[in-house]
């Protein structure tokens, strides 16, 4: 089983790329994170596994997460895949989570999906409603994540054109499957 970690700043298009890959590749599935937060009205049915804090902590203490963190008082974690999993697994997580995954599974394919430039990232963030101040904060965070990802050996994919980026990510996955 191949484990693919996809990270990148908000607005880079990683979610869109991940969905396109999973929809077009029957050998690839998107990981479902566990969370202790409450279900929102707009949550997609299979996006998360909603659990109590006690359930989360029990799995955590048993070593049952590839990576996990806390955000705004709620826990989020990516479960260790089942041994019987016959499909490759795609994780859409931040670089800090990717660091945890690599500590356990150093052969994971780690991809950093990025906008072609900070100006383009700013444009995308503002267009989706983040506002100028929030966009600047996200760009500063993206620079930090970019540097961390590079230090961890992530492969960078610039999403200047969505279809081209999807083809590039698919080629990296195919090469990893072939053992290249």
Region locations from a protein language model:
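Walker A/P-loop
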Residues: 15
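Small-molecule kinase domains that catalyze NTP-dependent phosphoryl transfer to phosphate-bearing small molecules
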Residues: 130-176
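The feature captures the helix immediately C-terminal to the Walker
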Residues: 18-19
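P-loop (Walker A) phosphate-binding loop of NTP-binding proteins
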Residues: 9
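ATP-dependent small-molecule kinase phosphotransfer cores
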Residues: 33-89, 96
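Post-Walker A helix-loop "phosphate-sensing" segment adjacent to the P-loop in P-loop NTPases
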Residues: 23-31
């Amino acid at each position: 089983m191949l484990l693919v970690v996809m990270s990148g700043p908000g607005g880079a298009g990683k979610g869109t790329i991940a969905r396109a890959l999973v929809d077009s590749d029957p050998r690839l599935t998107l990981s479902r994170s566990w969370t202790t937060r409450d279900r929102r009205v707009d949550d997609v049915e299979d996006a998360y596994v909603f659990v109590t804090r006690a359930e989360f902590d029990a799995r955590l203490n048993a070593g049952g997460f590839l990576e996990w963190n806390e955000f705004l008082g709620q826990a989020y974690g990516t479960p260790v895949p089942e041994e019987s999993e016959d499909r490759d697994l795609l994780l859409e997580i931040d670089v800090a989570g990717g660091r945890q995954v690599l500590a356990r599974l150093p052969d994971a394919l780690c991809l950093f999906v990025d906008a072609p430039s900070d100006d383009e990232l700013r444009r995308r963030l503002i267009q989706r409603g983040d506002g100028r101040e929030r966009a600047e904060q996200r760009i500063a965070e993206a620079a930090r994540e970019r540097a961390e990802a590079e230090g961890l050996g992530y492969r960078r994919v610039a999403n200047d054109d969505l279809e081209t980026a999807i083809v590039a990510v698919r080629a990296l996955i195919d090469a990893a499957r072939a053992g290249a």
